[in-house]
């Protein structure tokens, strides 16, 4: 079962929303993931990455949009993330999360100011958003798995507003399985550990990596 982040659940702020404009700044995207269901395009994630930062912007067909900036450590894990969720109606919600060795600290931006939430963790912790395959790719690369190996993470689920245990299994040299509460992703990987595409099981979404022209 997922654990709520303190008494200040991120999900309550995501539902309530904050009116405003996303403050996340990004560099020009170099790649994208196209998400489809049958012949329909469900969404697009534009992203870019250097050694220190990951930038991502997600546009869904429903009108929902996410903007993400993650600061990366030398081992490819995430040290800090800023995420903004913007609805079709222009309602914006912001969250900032720091990932320490044993503590995840979140700051939630609300109209009357900011609130703090913390959760103690054992082992590695990271952000997770099921529709951000750039973040999923970051998790795969930070796990440093060989063929047949697996790793467990405590993830702060940005969409659900809780924490949960996530497992990454390197099934074959060119594939991996990511599973957590109510989410299962089957990934096709390159030799460099990049996600080439895959399937969101249950939703029956397919996603494919493409270059931005």
Give the positions of each predicted feature:
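Bacterial N-terminal signal peptides that target proteins for export
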Residues: 1-10
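Bacterial N-terminal signal peptides
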Residues: 9-17
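Boundary at the C-terminal end of the N-terminal hydrophobic targeting segment
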Residues: 22-27
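Solvent-exposed helix/loop surface patches that form functional interfaces
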Residues: 28, 40-41, 87-180, 192, ...
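Short, small/polar residue-rich loop motifs at catalytic or cofactor-binding pockets
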Residues: 28-29, 65-66, 181-183
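N-terminal mature ectodomain segment of secretory-pathway/periplasmic proteins
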Residues: 31, 36-108, 193
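Short, exposed beta-strand-loop hairpins at the edges of beta-sheets
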Residues: 186-190, 194-203
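Short, basic/aromatic-enriched C-terminal tail that caps enzymatic domains
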Residues: 204-211
